[in-house]
Structures are given as structure tokens and as C-alpha cells.
């Protein structure tokens, strides 16, 4: 007897697992769309002129098992030594409870930015804990919910200082003891804005000549200085004082607020987040209350819901780029929410006593190490330090460094004659012995019990982390349950489709995520010798080659840490190109009115003037307006920024005409890669006339959104722009660093690399085709009930569609927000609201969603339309109905029901699961109350008790 062959690939072939609809379901969906097959649908959707000529030549897809084995082999080529290099990156211990329940938990890492507060209360509380931690440690009133890295935070603080300072100066003072990468990124940011950077000795600073100053605390070479007098001098001349501070050191040392600092920034990396060869890590920023509206980044605040119960939300959003555009405080979009949550949980896990004990142990080891070196005759500097010292070894520098490597230790090269040593949480007594041996010391007093090695007046006297949340979860059982309670309040991709237009919330597969936690990727210091990072080098080179093939560009830079930072880096490369050609005067950037808010904000950051371009009635770029303005500004045209396919969800046929006109008038073309999920394998921006693009690896290439970060936004360029890609002080060359580490956040790259390897070229192309199919299926199913605002010439949409709900405001008093909140009752995150057109919903299903989930969403939308019809026709009260009262909570269900519709209709609309229903923890959040009564730190414990009841 023989078995009949079954057409079934092994379970671990990702291209069968990543793509949601089965082949049979695709056939059914194609019938609904009216397309004969996928090829015909692609022909209808993409203009022939923009199709790429050759398929992706990646080879066949590898199975999950094969890819993981391959990644193990590559990772093993990295040599993970004990790095005592410091310079802003330190060994830390990630509590397994946090690694398992946060970092490796899809309930946390697949969530989106918490713009819909009712379904984001868990991570909003965790981020509020982060803000409280930062505010307490720095001694400043208001903190944000993270920035990309410490160097970026320094640059943001500099430009914030310029905004709020009353000084007329254009100069900014930088402490020479700042980390070199911080100085480099500030210099990059300052140049196009006309800010003069003065690097020098703080004691010789001319406070009258600057609008602000930044000081490193402790300094990059270990100095612990009191900057109180410097702050007073700055304030006397209406200038702003900034401190870039190590938060762990602040558990022992005088806080920046007590010195008079106006702004504090830094990295929370050593709060349980591994070095990761540079990232990702959550930077922080805190400031005085008077300056809170000028602070970049997201701020979590406390508000109330429609029943008066406490609720969290993102506050002061009118500062942000998606609203203010070129007038925004920054182009910050993606931040580091997941890493901020980890850092906050590290503080909750250890509490103030635990953090202080960790800091004390590190300091004692540093003092013990210094004493052993001094007793052996070495000169150690500084005398006052926290965890970092430098040692004068004269001509023996290279020998000592090599000897340390032989002992399994990386030290820092300082100048020509000194060696730097920074101790950390992972250091043990045998670490000190290995360092001593590298210096030729065979015996030292390892039992010495040292005192503090900084002046008594520098000891911190104020309390911190006094809120009960930092004192209540010592047992791991309670910690585990606390993290579970928070995640249960949220709606992430592990529960339901998140159909956010322009956000590409696709599957982040378990196999892709696994390598992030491997020690060979996670424990490498970004400034370790390059020969210790051979695995990273191989991976980055191969992934870069694949991305070049996908985009049609010639070179890739992995340095940008987000899409917005990629935009900034790309525009800097264009500016560098013009400058090299003697055309530095080119400073006009043409940007369509429909562009992402980051586009005009990024253009402003490189010192350009934004000239907006009108949209035609069909949503396309108004070509007459574009051509006229390109000609009008030809003498000064730097370039244009466009998104393709457009932000309206359509492949515009005029894209090559846009690029031709721009080049004709001397400009360069930036094609925003936000919608690359509709192009991979089908069309390449480099072939359309693009000179530079960024890629959102946290969209198209499967890095998870993490509730608002991490992200990566590498840029691809044509060869003529390659000399102007971001450089780094550790790698040399280029126009200047935009991130703290040479490759941004490289510990995320195994995710995108694994995705490419597991899908293969054919699989990546099929993913694009199915993403387009899914969007067209939704558009067709909703046809008749809702208008799709924009379509291509053949009636197709790209990978997303814009649903027009504006008529319902007039016919039934139903707003786009009402529909978004009603979708929560159905168990869905709302699509993108009021963008690119106010009063619309932009839907992007991605290729990962099954037909069943797409149908559930469509059923929910159609049921909502029926409810709107009931209001329109008088069958339902216009003010008291399921849409106006959405979302409904368990409290609503079990309380006295006095509404003119049933409990069942209110709480269990079509699309909602009855058994596994998601219940939002709060009713609709009051946005106005939250901004008028801004509270950005943890509320009193009584409020937590109330919530628990």
C-alpha cells in the first residue's frame, strides 16, 4: 500500500505561515474583487511603467529550522568578551522575569503606538512609570516617554534649548567630557541650523556667549563634577543648562535638578537592556515644568474617561510632527517604547533600594580596582568618579589593551597613552583580577572595603522612586502578575488585526524574534574591536545587499534608528551632495500636502524651506502645481519628498514625471519608504528616479512596533550620494553621525534578515501581492456601504484604502472617532484616523491576515454602517446610541442599564467574540481634560486601589 502524496510543505516554511490567506481563500477573494488571478490584479493595480524588470534573485526560501541554524553559525562568529569600554554602554543583567514577560512577549512587542488610549492602558501605565522614574532620578518635573538614543536626545535637548532660551546667541557650549558620539551627533544636528558648537572646558565657558550648554555627568572619562555654579552663570544670561546623566549614577549622586539644570537627558540602557552592539535602548529627557510644551517626543499623561474614572493618554499631541508638520518641536515619531517599558520594569523589579545597591556595588568595585592599580604604581584619573577611570600607561597602551583582550576583557583606548575602564553590573571579583593581570599586577587587595570616591557634597540627599509602584512587586509571582495585568488591558497583534494605514502591522514571527535574545547578538559592545563582530559584519553586509536589490539603490546605511531619522539622514546626504557641488544655496524642498508629517519636519531640521504642493481631486500630486513650483524655485531647489505608493493608497502614474521634473531643475528625489510593503518584488524606488529612500524595517521587514518603538530606518542611495551617507567616529568617513552607534540598533537586524531568508525572493514578492489583494478585498466588501475615497485608474487600491466617513457627521452626527471607538467594541484597533484626509479611516490589512479576520473586520464595519443608518432613519437616538457611548466596558455590562439599546447590542456587536471578547478597561478618554490638567507622573496609590476594585 502506498501513500497518496500530499501537497504540503514542512510546517516551518515561513512563506506558508507568514501569508494569511490560503491558496483556496485567495481564489475566493479574487472572485470578490473581480480579478481573474493575482497577476491580473497586479496588472490592474500597478502601472506597467513602474514594474521592475527582473524578479528578486535571493534563491529559494529556507525553512525556519535552517534559518535559525544559519543564524546560530553566523552569531557564533561574534566574539563576546567582557567589555569595560563604557562610553555610554555598560554590561547589565536583564532579569529573566522581564526578558520572558516583556521582551519576548507578543502582547508587548506587537502593540502599536498608544494613540487609541482606551486599548492601550497597560503600556501607558508602564510608560508613565518610566516617566516617573526619570523625573524622580533627575529631579525635574516632567519627563517624556523615551527618545531614540542618548546622542539623539542630546541633539534634541540642544534644539529645545534654542527654542526656549531668551538669549540671542547662536552658539551652544558642549562639555569636552561628553561622550564622543554625543558630540558628533550634536555637531551633525547643529550645522544645517546655523548653530555654532563650542567644545571646551566647562570652567572656561563664557555663559554670556551661548544660548545653552550641555554637561556629561559623570563625564566620559569618569569625572564627577558639580555643575551648580555653571547653571547659575547660564541662567544669569538667560541661557539653558542641560545635563546628560547616567541614571544609575543618579541613585548615588546629586541629581541635575538640584544643580539647577533645566533639561536632563541620558540613556536607560543599563536598566536591564543589553548592549546589543549599539541598540535599541531607550533614551530619556526631562525638563522643568515651564518648558514641557517645547519638549520633543511623546508624553503620557493622566486624564479621566467619560465616567470620570482615571485613564491614561498621550498628552500635548499638538507638539508632534503628525499635526505641526514643519513647525513641530522635532521629527520624532518612532521612539523606544518597548525598551522604556523594560527599563521601567527594571526599576519596579529592583526598587530604589535595589538600584542603589547595584550602583554601590559597581562603585565599590571601581574604587577597589583603582586602589590596586595605584598601589602598583599607576596614575589613575580622576580622583572623584563613579564607575569609570583612566590609567596612564605611557607607551604600553597597545600592549595593555592586547593583554586585556587575552584575558577576555575589552578596555577603551584614550588618547595615545591612557586606557579607560568602566565597570558595570556584570562585573565580578574575577573581572578585577583579570584587569589587574592585564596591567601586570599579580597580587592586589581584593578584600579592601572602600568608601565613596567622590566628595560628600556630591552624595544625593533627596528621595526617589517613592511611589508605591516601586515598592510593591518584590516577589516574582507578583511581578509576573503585574506585567500580565497590564498586557491584558491592551489590544495588540496577538489578539486581533491592527488595520492601521501606513503602519504595516504584519506578523512578527516567533522564529524571527528568537535571535534577538541570543547572547552572541545581545551582549556585544558597539565599540568593541571590529574583528570581534564578524558575525554582525556578515549579517549587515548580506542584508544590505538584499535591500539594495529590493530598492534599486547602490548603497545602504543602517545607522538611522527610525524612519524619521532615516528621512533626516537622507536629506543630509542630499545637502552634502549639493554642498560638494558648490550649490549649498539649494534649500527649497517640494512636499505634497498629503505627505507624512515627518517629511516637512525633517526638511526643517536640515535648514530647508518647505514649499507645499497641492493635491488633485483624485488625491494625486497636482502636476501643474508641482511643475510650476519646481520651475519657480529652480535656482534654489534642493529636492522633493514624495511617498510611493501615495499616502492615499494609490500607485500614481505620474511618479516618473515628478522625478524627471525635479532632476531637470537641479533637485534630488527623496522617496519615502513608508509604503514599501506594496512594492517589494514588484517595483523599485531607485528605478523610478529616486535618489534616496528610507526603509521602515519595523513595517515592511517584520521588526515589531513595540508599542511605539523600537524601529530602524536604514537609507538606500544612488552611488552619487554614497559619499554623503552618515559616518561615525568609530568607522570614519561620511557626512556625520545621526545615531549614537555606527549601525543604529543592530540587534534588531536578525529579525529582518531572517524574514528575507525564510521568505526568499519569491516569498517576499508574494507577500506584496497578497497585501494588495487583501486591501482590494476589503475595499470591495465595503463597497456600497462606504466610499473608498481614492482609487487608481482601473478602480484598484494599493496595499491600503481610505474610507470616507465624513458624510455621516452630517447625516447622523457620527464622527470618525465614534466609528473608531465602536470598532473597539468589535475587538479591533481602529484604522488610521483623519489622515491623510480629515474625517476618514485609512485601512491597511497587510499580507499576514487570514480571510476570516478580514471578514470579521468587514462584518464589523458593515454592522457599524447599519447602526448609522438606524440613526439616520430615526430608529436610534442621535445622542444616546452604541456609537456615541463606545467603547463599552465590563462595568457598563454589569451596571444598571438605562440606555435605549440592549446590553447585547452595545457590548457584543457583529465581529466581537463572545467567549474571548476584548474588554477595554476604560470608557472613552477625555482628551481636553488631560491637556488642561496635565499630570505626567504616577498618580497616588489610592487611584490604583480604585482601579483594582
Curated annotation (Swiss-Prot):
GO terms for biological process: glycine decarboxylation via glycine cleavage system. It catalyses: N(6)-[(R)-lipoyl]-L-lysyl-[glycine-cleavage complex H protein] + glycine + H(+) = N(6)-[(R)-S(8)-aminomethyldihydrolipoyl]-L-lysyl-[glycine-cleavage complex H protein] + CO2. Its EC number is 1.4.4.2. It holds the Pfam family GDC-P. It is an enzyme of class 1 (oxidoreductase). The glycine cleavage system catalyzes the degradation of glycine. The P protein binds the alpha-amino group of glycine through its pyridoxal phosphate cofactor; CO(2) is released and the remaining methylamine moiety is then transferred to the lipoamide cofactor of the H protein. The glycine cleavage system is composed of four proteins: P, T, L and H. This is Glycine dehydrogenase (decarboxylating). It comes from Roseobacter denitrificans (strain ATCC 33942 / OCh 114) (Erythrobacter sp. (strain OCh 114)).
Amino acid at each position: 500500500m502506498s501513500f497518496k502524496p500530499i501537497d504540503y510543505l514542512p510546517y516551518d516554511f515561513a512563506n506558508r505561515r507568514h501569508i494569511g490567506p490560503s491558496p483556496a481563500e485567495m481564489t475566493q477573494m479574487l472572485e470578490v474583487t473581480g480579478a481573474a488571478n493575482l497577476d491580473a490584479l497586479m496588472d490592474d493595480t500597478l502601472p506597467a511603467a513602474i514594474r521592475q524588470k527582473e524578479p528578486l534573485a535571493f534563491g529559494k526560501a529556507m525553512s525556519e529550522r535552517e534559518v535559525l541554524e544559519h543564524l546560530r553559525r553566523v552569531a557564533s562568529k561574534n566574539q563576546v568578551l567582557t567589555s569595560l569600554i563604557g562610553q555610554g554602554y555598560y554590561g547589565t543583567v536583564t532579569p529573566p522575569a522581564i526578558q520572558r514577560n516583556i521582551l519576548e512577549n507578543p502582547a508587548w512587542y506587537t502593540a502599536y503606538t498608544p494613540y487609541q488610549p482606551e486599548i492601550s492602558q497597560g503600556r501607558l501605565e508602564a510608560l508613565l512609570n518610566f516617566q516617573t522614574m526619570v523625573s524622580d532620578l533627575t529631579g525635574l518635573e516632567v519627563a517624556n516617554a523615551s527618545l531614540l538614543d542618548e546622542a539623539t536626545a542630546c541633539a534634541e535637548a540642544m534644539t529645545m534649548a534654542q527654542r526656549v532660551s531668551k538669549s540671542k546667541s547662536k552658539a551652544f557650549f558642549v562639555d569636552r567630557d561628553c561622550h564622543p558620539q554625543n558630540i558628533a551627533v550634536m555637531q551633525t544636528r547643529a550645522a544645517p541650523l546655523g548653530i555654532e558648537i563650542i567644545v571646551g572646558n566647562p570652567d572656561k565657558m563664557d555663559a554670556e556667549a551661548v544660548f545653552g550648554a550641555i554637561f556629561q555627568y559623570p563625564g566620559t572619562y569618569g569625572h564627577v563634577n558639580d555643575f551648580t555654579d555653571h547653571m547659575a552663570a547660564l541662567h544669569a544670561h538667560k541661557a539653558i543648562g542641560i545635563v546628560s546623566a547616567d541614571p544609575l549614577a543618579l541613585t548615588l549622586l546629586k541629581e541635575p535638578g538640584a544643580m539647577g539644570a533645566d533639561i536632563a537627558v541620558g540613556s536607560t540602557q543599563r536598566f536591564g537592556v543589553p548592549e546589543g552592539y549599539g541598540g535599541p535602548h531607550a533614551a530619556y529627557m526631562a525638563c522643568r515644568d515651564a518648558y514641557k510644551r517645547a519638549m520633543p517626543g511623546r508624553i503620557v499623561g493622566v486624564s479621566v474617561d467619560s465616567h470620570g474614572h482615571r485613564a491614561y493618554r498621550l498628552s500635548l499631541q499638538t507638539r508632534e510632527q503628525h499635526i505641526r508638520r514643519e513647525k513641530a518641536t522635532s521629527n520624532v515619531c518612532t521612539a523606544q517604547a518597548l525598551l522604556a517599558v523594560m527599563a521601567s520594569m527594571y526599576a519596579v523589579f529592583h526598587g530604589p533600594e535595589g538600584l542603589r545597591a547595584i550602583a554601590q556595588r559597581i562603585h565599590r568595585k571601581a574604587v577597589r580596582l583603582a586602589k590596586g592599580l595605584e598601589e602598583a604604581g599607576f596614575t589613575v584619573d580622576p580622583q572623584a568618579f563613579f564607575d569609570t577611570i583612566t590609567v596612564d600607561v605611557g607607551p604600553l597602551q597597545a600592549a595593555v589593551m592586547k593583554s586585556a583582550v587575552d584575558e577576555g576583557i575589552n578596555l577603551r583606548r584614550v588618547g595615545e597613552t591612557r586606557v579607560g575602564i568602566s565597570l558595570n553590573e556584570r562585573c565580578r571579583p574575577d573581572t578585577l583580577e583579570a584587569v589587574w593581570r592585564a596591567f601586570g599586577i599579580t597580587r592586589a587587595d581584593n578584600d579592601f572595603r572602600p568608601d565613596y570616591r567622590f566628595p560628600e557634597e556630591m552624595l544625593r540627599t533627596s528621595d526617589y522612586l517613592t511611589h508605591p509602584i516601586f515598592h510593591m512587586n518584590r516577589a516574582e509571582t507578583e511581578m509576573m502578575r503585574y506585567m500580565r495585568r497590564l498586557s491584558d488591558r491592551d489590544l495588540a497583534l496577538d489578539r486581533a488585526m491592527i488595520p492601521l494605514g501606513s503602519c504595516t502591522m504584519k506578523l512578527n514571527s516567533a522564529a524571527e524574534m528568537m535571535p534577538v535574545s541570543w547572547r552572541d547578538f545581545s551582549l556585544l559592545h558597539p565599540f568593541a574591536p571590529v574583528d570581534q563582530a564578524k558575525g554582525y559584519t556578515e549579517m549587515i553586509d548580506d542584508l544590505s545587499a538584499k535591500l539594495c536589490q529590493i530598492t534599486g539603490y547602490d548603497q545602504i546605511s543602517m545607522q538611522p534608528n527610525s524612519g524619521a531619522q532615516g528621512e533626516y539622514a537622507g536629506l543630509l546626504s542630499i545637502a552634502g551632495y549639493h554642498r560638494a557641488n558648490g550649490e549649498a544655496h539649494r534649500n527649497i524642498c517640494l512636499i505634497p500636502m498629503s505627505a507624512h508629517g515627518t517629511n516637512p519636519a525633517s526638511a526643517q531640521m536640515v535648514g530647508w524651506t518647505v514649499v507645499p504642493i497641492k493635491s488633485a481631486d483624485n488625491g494625486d500630486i497636482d502636476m501643474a502645481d508641482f511643475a510650476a513650483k519646481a520651475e519657480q524655485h529652480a535656482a534654489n531647489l534642493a529636492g522633493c519628498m514624495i511617498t510611493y505608493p501615495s499616502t492615499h493608497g494609490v500607485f500614481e502614474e505620474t511618479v516618473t514625471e515628478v522625478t524627471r521634473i525635479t532632476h531637470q531643475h537641479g533637485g534630488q528625489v527623496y522617496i519615502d519608504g513608508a509604503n514599501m510593503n506594496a512594492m517589494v518584488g514588484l517595483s523599485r524606488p531607485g528605478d523610478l528616479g529616486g535618489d534616496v529612500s528610507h526603509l521602515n524595517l519595523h513595517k515592511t521587514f517584520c521588526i515589531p512596533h513595540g508599542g511605539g518603538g523600537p524601529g530602524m530606518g536604514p537609507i538606500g542611495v544612488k552611488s552619487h550620494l554614497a559619499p554623503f551617507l552618515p559616518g561615525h567616529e568609530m568607522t570614519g568617513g561620511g557626512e556625520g553621525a545621526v545615531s549614537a552607534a555606527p549601525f543604529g540598533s543592530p540587534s534588531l537586524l536578525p529579525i529582518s534578515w531572517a524574514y528575507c531568508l525564510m521568505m526568499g525572493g519569491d516569498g517576499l514578492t508574494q507577500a506584496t501581492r497578497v497585501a494588495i489583494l487583501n486591501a482590494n478585498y476589503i475595499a470591495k466588501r465595503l463597497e456600497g456601504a462606504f466610499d473608498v475615497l481614492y482609487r487608481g485608474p482601473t478602480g484598484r487600491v494599493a496595499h491600503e484604502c481610505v474610507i470616507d466617513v465624513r458624510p455621516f457627521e452630517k447625516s447622523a452626527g457620527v464622527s470618525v472617532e465614534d466609528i473608531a471607538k465602536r470598532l473597539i467594541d468589535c475587538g479591533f484597533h481602529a484604522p488610521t484616523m483623519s489622515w491623510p484626509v480629515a474625517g476618514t479611516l485609512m485601512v491597511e490589512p497587510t499580507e499576514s491576515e487570514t480571510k476570516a479576520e478580514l471578514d470579521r473586520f468587514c462584518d464589523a464595519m458593515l454592522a457599524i454602517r447599519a447602526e448609522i443608518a438606524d440613526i439616520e432613519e430615526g430608529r436610534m437616538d442621535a445622542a444616546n446610541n452604541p456609537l456615541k457611548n463606545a467603547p463599552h466596558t465590563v462595568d457598563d455590562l454589569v451596571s444598571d442599564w438605562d440606555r435605549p439599546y440592549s446590553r447585547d447590542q452595545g457590548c457584543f456587536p457583529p465581529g466581537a467574540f463572545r467567549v474571548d471578547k476584548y474588554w477595554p478597561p476604560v470608557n472613552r478618554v477625555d482628551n481636553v481634560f488631560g491637556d488642561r490638567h496635565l499630570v505626567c507622573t504616577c498618580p497616588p496609590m489610592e487611584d490604583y486601589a480604585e482601579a483594582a476594585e
